[in-house]
Amino acid sequence: MDFLNSSDQNLTSEELLNRMPSKILVSLTLSGLALMTTTINCLVITAIIVTRKLHHPANYLICSLAVTDFLVAVLVMPFSIVYIVRESWIMGQGLCDLWLSVDIICCTCSILHLSAIALDRYRAITDAVEYARKRTPRHAGITITTVWVISVFISVPPLFWRHQGNSRDDQCIIKHDHIVSTIYSTFGAFYIPLVLILILYYKIYRAARTLYHKRQASRMIKEELNGQVLLESGEKSIKLVSTSYMLEKSLSDPSTDFDRIHSTVKSPRSELKHEKSWRRQKISGTRERKAATTLGLILGAFVICWLPFFVKELVVNICEKCKISEEMSNFLAWLGYLNSLINPLIYTIFNEDFKKAFQKLVRCRN
């Protein structure tokens, strides 16, 4: 987003020559990140468009997120690279206004898309039956439109406030002269969505964990009922005894006398059922860990990429004595841009349908 750059007019030719290798390295690194972001998001968009199996309202949100991140890669990153390498804005104030507008709107829209996806997943888990009827392409379209409209409303006011200050021709930044404007832009674009995402994904994890445990308990009860066998004990009446209980008893207490118990208790079928139950429990635990890992990656990437930048924005613009170096400011801005590269990876890498679609696209290219 907006970051401060200084002019290199006061530098001597020798100093400029000495700094050339580092500038080339920075230029190549940032250009590589921009190219990767463009390619991966383009791949996600293409996969969703050409693969019929991916034509689902939930994936339309992911496609819209990929479009937003694609715009960041092709309309925001290249100008930022030139600005950083040149250390001054050389493209005029008209293009500066346009670049800042696209930068703020697209980055805000990308963040709000993450909130919309979190809300969509939360409703799909907690209100599956009712939400399945509402989860239509039209509903996804309304959600996407709402996200873009909110992004514009959050992003436009800071652009108007920018013109209240005296901007230099060689700078392309937004000066937050008012605390109100700083709080409005940072809370609207990041802090409120962050709180919403944290709450939703916490509830999603709890709901998913409860669902796994309920399914596991239901399977165990079903196997208990299906595994009951008839036993005879002298002149006593016939009783129903669970085979899984007998197997657990035999493992926990080897001294137990099972000679009087019917031989079917130790039958291979009973042992097979117990083994199957254990495997299901293991699979359920694996799925729970996978869900936790996925949610952790989503939240971790979002917080790591954007939190430092917005903390800097809040602190620097509220505290007049607080300063930050040009290099650190640029680094934090690009750390935020990096989220546009990570998003398509996280939201598709754990989906088998996306994996197959990507493999198909790569094979077609070859």
UniProtKB/Swiss-Prot annotation:
Coarse class of the protein's main subcellular location: membrane
The keyword Magnesium belongs to this UniProt entry's keyword annotation: no
Disulfide bonds: 96-172
One GO CC term on file: synapse
Residue ranges annotated as Cytoplasmic topological domain: 50-59, 120-139, 203-291, 351-366
Recorded GO MF terms: G protein-coupled serotonin receptor activity; Gi/o-coupled serotonin receptor activity; neurotransmitter receptor activity; serotonin binding; serotonin receptor activity
Extent of motif DRY motif: 120-122
Bilayer topology annotation: Multi-pass membrane protein
InterPro entries according to UniProt: 5HT1F_rcpt, 5HT_rcpt, GPCR_Rhodpsn, GPCR_Rhodpsn_7TM
Transmembrane residue ranges: 25-49, 60-81, 97-119, 140-159, 179-202, 292-315, 328-350
Residue positions the entry lists as glycosylated: 5, 10
UniProt record, GO biological process: adenylate cyclase-inhibiting G protein-coupled receptor signaling pathway; adenylate cyclase-inhibiting serotonin receptor signaling pathway; chemical synaptic transmission; G protein-coupled receptor signaling pathway, coupled to cyclic nucleotide second messenger
Entry's localization field: Cell membrane
Extracellular side: 1-24, 82-96, 160-178, 316-327
A family per Pfam: 7tm_1
Binding site for serotonin: 103, 107
Keyword Repeat: no
Alphabetical UniProt keywords: Cell membrane, Disulfide bond, G-protein coupled receptor, Glycoprotein, Membrane, Receptor, Transducer, Transmembrane, Transmembrane helix
Domain of life: Eukaryota
Residues spanned by motif NPxxY motif: 343-347
Its job: G-protein coupled receptor for 5-hydroxytryptamine (serotonin). Also functions as a receptor for various alkaloids and psychoactive substances. Ligand binding causes a conformation change that triggers signaling via guanine nucleotide-binding proteins (G proteins) and modulates the activity of downstream effectors, such as adenylate cyclase. HTR1F is coupled to G(i)/G(o) G alpha proteins and mediates inhibitory neurotransmission by inhibiting adenylate cyclase activity.
Sequence similarity: Belongs to the G-protein coupled receptor 1 family.
PANTHER family attached to this UniProt entry: 5-HYDROXYTRYPTAMINE RECEPTOR 1D (PTHR24248:SF196), ADRENERGIC RECEPTOR-RELATED G-PROTEIN COUPLED RECEPTOR (PTHR24248)
Name of the protein: 5-hydroxytryptamine receptor 1F
Biological source species: Rattus norvegicus (Rat)
